[in-house]
């Protein structure tokens, strides 16, 4: 293990050493670039593009390109990127993660690799965690730098309409958010008109700001486009009413994993309450699902920590950023269970229409890189999942922040008292203070305690996130006290006011350790930017959630130790206790990493299926002649279906049975002539099958040509039939695929997904998922064939959207998936 870590460490040093050689070449061109006139920069960009087209690589162009960007940045913004920013930019171009501390200038750093990679003609996406940051860069001086260099730059945000998005995606460099990118991808793959597609260029290169937040913290949160599901509001209310009657003996909570189940007594109580014999009978599966959600809502989800209630709505709080997740809902009915718990309006439950995780979305890019101040603790995950190394970039000026050892207490109350005392002492000196909390609830507790001591302060949490920029702008001024959840202005520097450096800079006080050391480091990183002085210290207790949930039996020994060394409730430091908390964090980080890897294994099954479906959709959507695709599908389907009828061509009634089968399954009645079919059956089986297939192909071609002529004459549009065929095929695919996604979700639960870590459950999911997928593909092809061959006459045909009901009538989706078993057929390209 030590050898492996040493190898990784040496690899990072080696990468930085190589980057220095390149950075020196960039610096050596500083004087040359300073001689250029403003109008020369566009000319120089065109020259670099031509050199790339003639065969020079981006690596060969890098020194000149970066030097050009440095000079352009200086002229437009008045700021010259430091040497360390050049190092970071080189690491980004190499497809790795540049770990740059707060205030080291990640924004300027990103311009260089974005410019260089845009010279290839492929788009570059600079991805931020929120629209505020994307707008700031696009609308400010940063966007002007790209224009000065002769590149186009765009912005893609939620409020953009289709035309605005299309223009933005055509730009050389695009500023956008991770969520908008993902949703655009899903929406494009649900589109039925190619003219409305917004992402028409390849996924070439992405630079992700706050990369750990997006690829680690949000990795377990899928992007979902949902649609209305069945109405079940009464069940949520009934389950909520039942759970309110429970006592501790009726349920069992596993604190570490936050899972909850009914005990035997709880099951008996449920069966009595709902007047049923067996709660686990298949007919009560929906009721059981609602009870489980109600249990989670009541006993594992906490108001002002996991969610908040505002204007009669339940709003999710992001556990890593502290922000409200606008427009998001907890999935699988949990959100509705929380609404029932809080007595607010229960929204319509939704089912999944399309979904993708950030893990799989960003792996669509040919090259991926990222920036953050805190990635080193997660470098194994970045390497294993995304094939990116984390390279620590040195600071431009030495880091002089003082990070004091944790203050440790037995009780939370003792901890809060000491925190307030420290705040009072430093506030009297005029030193600005940032108090970091893990939840909205704790931030409000601290606020009340400060108010009792007449300390004027600002509070920044999910309830008033709209004031974030204003609060952060003042957080570094003399006498300011700011309480913040871990949203704490990430992406925005806290600048010190006049005279604050002499007072020791910003003091950061943490109210408890987070599950991840990385989040702790982010809080510390608010102080000590760009060589400024600063101070940080965490206040922790044995009653903190981290210790209670993950401490296990050792927590009792820790409490005993604390009581021995601290009999007065005063602050104390203990290396042993600090190490105990650090070990817990490492354990949780490792467990979360394992869980994300396990989730990815499951999601990769969906990814393969999704890519097959989306590839087929694109072929149909972009084809100038979709009727040819339809004819090919129809021929394959029917040709396969008729094979059993040709095993014995001498059977006297075989032609009649074949015609009956075809006209019942696919064709309109009266399509076939019995004498023509009988004549074919007079030949040998193999010859007869070959001839009949030709006969069928001719029939289908004639039907399509007749339909095409009729549709085009009726609507006076030579392209109308193509549009109708395309619409029918896409709608059939979409309706079945939406159902398939939800079936896969049911399957995931059915194979015991909650008990992850058992290889058997994954193999079962993989096998049954393939069966479901094959069945879906068969149904899609059958429906396309039948729908097209039985098209209504033109005079009765309405515009495509009004025909949706005639496409899919089979609503008998089999939810008892795990009981089915059959041989697995591997489908990679099912329709080709």
Swiss-Prot record:
The entry marks the following residues as binding ATP, namely: 85, 103-107, 493
Q: Name one GO molecular function term.
A: ATP binding
Q: What is its main location?
A: membrane
List the PROSITE patterns hit by this protein, alphabetically: SECA (PS01312), SECA_MOTOR_DEAD (PS51196)
Name of the top EC class for this enzyme: translocase
Q: Which Pfam families match?
A: P-loop_SecA (PF21090), SecA_DEAD (PF07517), SecA_PP_bind (PF01043), SecA_SW (PF07516)
SMART domains named among the record's database cross-references: SecA_DEAD, SecA_PP_bind
Which keywords, in A-to-Z order, does the entry hold?
Answer: ATP-binding, Cell membrane, Cytoplasm, Membrane, Nucleotide-binding, Protein transport, Translocase, Translocation, Transport
Q: Show the catalytic activity.
A: ATP + H2O + cellular proteinSide 1 = ADP + phosphate + cellular proteinSide 2
| GO BP terms, alphabetized | intracellular protein transmembrane transport; protein import; protein targeting; protein transport by the Sec complex
**Basic residues composition bias: which ranges?**
818-832
Membrane topology, as annotated: Peripheral membrane protein
Quote the EC number: 7.4.2.8
Q: Does the keyword Cytoplasm apply?
A: yes
NCBIfam families xref list:
PRK09200.1, secA
Role summary: Part of the Sec protein translocase complex. Interacts with the SecYEG preprotein conducting channel. Has a central role in coupling the hydrolysis of ATP to the transfer of proteins into and across the cell membrane, serving as an ATP-driven molecular motor driving the stepwise translocation of polypeptide chains across the membrane.
- Annotated HAMAP family: SecA
Q: What is this protein called?
A: Protein translocase subunit SecA
Species of provenance: Phytoplasma australiense
């Amino acid at each position: 293990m030590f050898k492996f870590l040493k190898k990784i460490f040496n690899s990072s040093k080696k990468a930085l050493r190589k980057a220095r050689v390149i950075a020196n070449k960039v610096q050596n061109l500083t004087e040359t670039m300073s001689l250029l006139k403003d109008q020369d920069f566009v000319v120089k960009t065109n020259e670099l593009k031509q050199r790339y087209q003639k065969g020079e690589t981006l690596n060969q162009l890098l020194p000149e390109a970066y030097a050009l960007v440095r000079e352009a940045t200086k002229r437009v913004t008045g700021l010259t990127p430091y040497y360390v920013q050049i190092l970071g930019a080189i690491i980004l171009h190499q497809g790795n993660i540049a770990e740059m501390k707060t205030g080291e200038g990640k924004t300027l750093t990103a311009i260089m690799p974005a410019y260089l990679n845009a010279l290839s003609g492929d788009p570059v996406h600079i991805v931020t965690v929120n629209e505020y940051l994307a707008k700031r860069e696009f609308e400010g001086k940063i966007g002007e730098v790209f224009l000065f260099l002769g590149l186009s730059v765009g912005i893609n945000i939620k409020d953009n309409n289709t035309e605005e998005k299309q223009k933005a995606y055509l730009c050389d460099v695009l500023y956008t958010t991770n969520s908008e990118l993902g949703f655009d991808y899903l929406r494009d793959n649900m589109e039925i008109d190619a003219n409305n597609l917004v992402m028409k260029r390849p996924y070439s290169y992405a630079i992700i700001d706050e990369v750990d937040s997006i690829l680690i913290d949000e990795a377990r949160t899928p992007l979902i486009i949902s649609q209305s599901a069945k109405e079940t509001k009464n069940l949520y209310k009934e389950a909520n009413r039942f759970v309110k009657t429970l006592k501790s003996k009726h349920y069992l909570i596993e604190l570490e994993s936050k899972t909850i189940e009914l005990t035997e007594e709880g099951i008996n109580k449920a069966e009595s309450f709902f007047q049923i014999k067996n709660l686990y009978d298949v007919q009560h599966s929906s009721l059981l699902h609602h009870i489980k959600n109600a249990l989670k809502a009541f006993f594992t989800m906490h108001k002002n920590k996991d969610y908040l209630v505002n204007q009669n709505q339940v709003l999710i709080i992001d556990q890593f950023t502290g922000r409200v997740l606008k427009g998001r809902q907890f999935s699988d009915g949990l959100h509705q269970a929380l609404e029932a718990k809080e007595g607010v309006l229960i929204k319509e439950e939704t089912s999944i229409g399309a979904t993708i995780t950030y893990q799989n979305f960003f792996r669509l890019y040919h090259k991926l890189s990222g920036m953050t101040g805190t990635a080193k603790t997660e470098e194994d995950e970045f390497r294993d999942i995304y094939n990116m190394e984390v390279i620590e970039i040195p600071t431009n000026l030495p880091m002089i922040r003082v990070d004091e050892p944790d203050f440790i207490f037995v009780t939370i109350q003792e901890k809060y008292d000491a925190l307030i005392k420290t705040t009072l002492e430093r506030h009297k000196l005029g030193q600005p203070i940032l108090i970091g909390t893990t939840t909205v609830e704790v931030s409000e507790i601290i606020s009340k305690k400060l108010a009792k001591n007449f300390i004027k302060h600002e509070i920044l949490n999910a309830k008033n996130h709209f004031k974030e920029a204003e609060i952060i702008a003042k957080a570094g001024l003399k006498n300011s006290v700011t309480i913040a959840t871990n949203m704490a202005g990430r992406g925005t520097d806290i600048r010190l006011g006049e005279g604050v450096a002499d007072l020791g800079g910003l003091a950061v006080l943490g109210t408890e350790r987070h599950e991840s050391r990385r989040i702790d480091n982010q809080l510390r990183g608010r102080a000590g930017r760009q060589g400024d002085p600063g101070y940080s210290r965490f206040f922790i207790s044995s009653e903190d959630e981290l210790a209670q949930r993950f401490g296990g039996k050792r927590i009792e020994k820790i409490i005993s130790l604390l009581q021995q060394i601290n009999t007065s409730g005063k602050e104390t430091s203990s290396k042993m206790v600090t190490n105990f908390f650090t070990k817990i964090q490492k354990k949780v980080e490792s467990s979360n990493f394992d869980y994300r890897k396990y989730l990815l294994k499951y999601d990769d099954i969906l990814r393969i299926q999704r890519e097959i479906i989306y590839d087929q959709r694109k072929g149909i959507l972009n084809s100038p002649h979709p009727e040819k695709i339809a004819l090919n599908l129809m021929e394959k389907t029917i040709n396969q279906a008729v094979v059993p009828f040709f095993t014995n061509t001498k059977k006297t009634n075989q032609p009649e049975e074949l015609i009956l089968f075809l006209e019942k399954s696919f064709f309109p009645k009266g399509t076939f002539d019995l004498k023509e079919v009988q004549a074919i059956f007079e030949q040998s089986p193999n010859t007869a099958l070959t001839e009949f297939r030709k006969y069928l192909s001719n029939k289908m071609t004639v039907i399509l040509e007749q339909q095409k002529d009729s549709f085009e004459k009726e609507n006076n549009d030579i392209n109308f039939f193509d549009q109708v065929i395309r619409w029918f095929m896409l709608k059939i695919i979409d309706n079945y695929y939406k159902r398939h996604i939800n079936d896969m979700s049911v399957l995931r639960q059915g194979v015991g997904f909650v008990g992850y870590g058992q290889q058997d459950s994954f193999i079962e999911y993989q096998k049954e998922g393939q069966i479901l997928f094959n069945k879906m593909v068969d149904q899609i092809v059958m429906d396309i064939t039948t729908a097209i061959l039985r098209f209504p006459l033109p005079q009765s045909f309405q515009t495509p959207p009004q025909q949706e009901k005639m496409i899919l009538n089979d609503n008998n989706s089999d939810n008892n998936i795990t009981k089915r078993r059959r041989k697995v057929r591997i489908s990679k390209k099912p329709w080709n």
